[in-house]
């Protein structure tokens, strides 16, 4: 029988590790919690540079997924993953301040769950599930919420950005692009978390050449793992004066993608962000299965 909880606006803590794509694929589950508990105070414990996306947008206009974000990479938190250790008093107060904790962390022996109980957490929902090749990942990531009577009405990830994030993109473009708005902006993200999933960088160069020849302005996006590809494309596409978005905060990347008429990328977290903000995407899937992992 599904567990029943109060429909009053509670304090909810969502705990989500994983990479960028994993986080975005969990947004439908977070949106379902917001729909089930309108006005709830949600916070996210996760990798801060990723989870902060939830501070800058939400499932609908004027909303955010999170009111606050806390970094999961915190030394005192390690005791919560071990047996019979003293627990940090401040973290105990933090966890026990929530009416419900929902965790997507792998916890096969329930050590973390047990320690949250020791910390004073009364309502805990273990939402982790290993993703198989059955249904779409967003459906699998939300499946455990049915046990607390939270249905997944919409499996699509939506990230409607706050005006402050959109303004940051306008300012970034204005500083770098004298003809901003006069040419269509096309985004290219040549990397991913695995070289096996990457389209050859020479093909990205050819795509950039063709897009520029058709009158588009190029926006090339990447992080530290994409340095070699970005350096190559910056050099080879230099005649087209591409805009380079290197190592930018994710909310700024998301906002820049809302300004693009098209986005091209591999199976990667940035591609999930592009789809979530409503960009028109062409995504290349190699060894991974799009029926499970595509936006």
Predicted regions: what they are:
Residues 1-295:
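Catalytic machinery of carbohydrate-active enzymes
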